[in-house]
């Protein structure tokens, strides 16, 4: 989950995005997000049109005078989503890889032998999972418990472990038949991230951000992690069979998937705990120790300023109501499970996975996921920029834009990189939605025009650059777009660009590296439905 502007500089409740000196994705994505209390339910923050969901979380700021909204500014009217309306239904198995068992190898189509692709994937895996601990790997084993080895995937630059990365790591492991790594990650997630305290209304979900020692940075969940947990567990059940306890993969997948739709509506008063025996989680009075924050402290000191820890008013006791991760009326995954959230994140939408859940998941939920797949396909078409193919980081359930206090709609940002991969994999596996070809053509044509080796990683939906960084993760996911794009020079150029891109290393290797490795697997036909 990525909300732009969190680590920008400003006074109280001042979060503005500047093009100059753009923070890296790991600086901005998810840092400081906790239990995800809805901003739109907070009169204080609603005035500013900011999605600040940081219950009990310290957010780093540079100390500056408090900025006031202009006199003529008036708070936005709370949005009421329109009914879903008619959605084109796409029953049956389609004509994609699920039916044909054929997965395109885009690299082989351009003259790179399959054995070279497999070697490239294995090299990336070994570096990211077992390479040098300072510069290359993001997978770290931490001993064992009664369930076996324990390991986490870390966002190195922010020094935390996230359900997003844990579930991505599990998906990579099951696809590449790396059972030890899969089980160690799943064991760590269950041991430390699974919320078991019945007084936490997010009980049964996984806390989205943790310190790498297993202590919390949050006490709430982000649905993109749960989604990849579910899919990787079903694949593990089919690849390795079911074991006992937490290694009964199908039972665990069913349990999470049921919870995503049927989690009871619970209200609690925080601060909350992950486990009953834990102390209540209250954010520290300083920024979390990390390479990103250290750099920001140095930059602030050079200007004669001090990096301060900003605490939201919810550090005091607060009430929070949590329910399902889906909106029943709109058949959509929610941004977070808070009851008052009325918007989604396009990059959370995984119609290729939903089709499988409609076949493999709990019987009572299969029709829901079948329709959710069709809704996601329709949403991609309706929320993308008509000339650019860029998706917003967030939009309302009725496909309308979320407008900030300055009148600007939510832009294409770091989470958004994943959307093109999501609809293109859906096209590859199911071949049900021909409009996905048009969408891949649009985004590839736009970014090619920006410069295939120089396009930036944040834009307005109509194509105005909002950053100055060219990101490997975005190159990788856009290359996956070639699974759906019209074959031609542009789609081939993106595949070749990914082929010649080295494995990400250094401080920002987490998000770029995860997307890079999964994209190599998709583009080579090695990311498959495991039946």
Stretch-by-stretch model annotation:
Residues 42-56:
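Bacterial N-terminal signal peptides
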Residues 78-123, 127-130, 134-137, 156-163, ...:
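Extended ligand-binding clefts on enzyme/binding-domain cores
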Residues 169, 181-182, 246, 253, ...:
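Solenoid-repeat scaffolds in large eukaryotic assemblies
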Residues 497-507:
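Solenoid-like repeat scaffolds
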Residues 159-169, 215-241:
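Aromatic-rich carbohydrate-recognition surfaces in CAZymes
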Residues 58-60:
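Boundary at the C-terminal end of the N-terminal hydrophobic targeting segment
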Residues 179-221, 454-458:
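Helix-terminus loop motifs that line ligand-binding clefts
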